[in-house]
Amino acid sequence: MQVKRLFVALLFLLFVFYSCLDFTEVSYRGLPITIEYEKGTVRSGIDKEGNPWQQEMFYHYGYFNNILGEDCEELDVYYNPDGKSDKIFRITQLDVLTKEFDEYKIMLGFSTIEDAKQGYLVHYPDGWVGFGGIEEISFKDLSK
């Protein structure tokens, strides 16, 4: 019973903390995007092997509101705030341990497929094995 109370209290504190964060909201062709990490900030976490990591963000990073990815979570997006291109690129990210499909990452504001690929890879260590490919997609494919 004590563990359950502690768990509920922890969830409540996480909810309060998360709701106090001031995320930037932008829109792409009418689709709302929440920017969790702006260009120039530092993103951090713990990888699947339990190792802490941190990464300076060279582009905005967030997610599309109300668009779920294949992993049933909001679809992640890297957004180049200085870019003028309307092209949409989709990265296939692999699980680094199993090398199987993990999730998609959308790249916005990049003019070429190579720019989008480099915009993704710059956020990962050299030799990153989580990159599974990139393709240009249509707005219709994105918004369905």
Regions found by a protein language model. Give the residues of each.
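Sec-dependent signal peptide recognition
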Residues: K4-A9
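Bacterial Sec-dependent signal peptides at the C-terminal "C-region" and cleavage site
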Residues: L13-C20
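Hydrophobic N-terminal alpha-helices or hydrophobic patches in metabolic proteins across all domains
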Residues: L21-K144
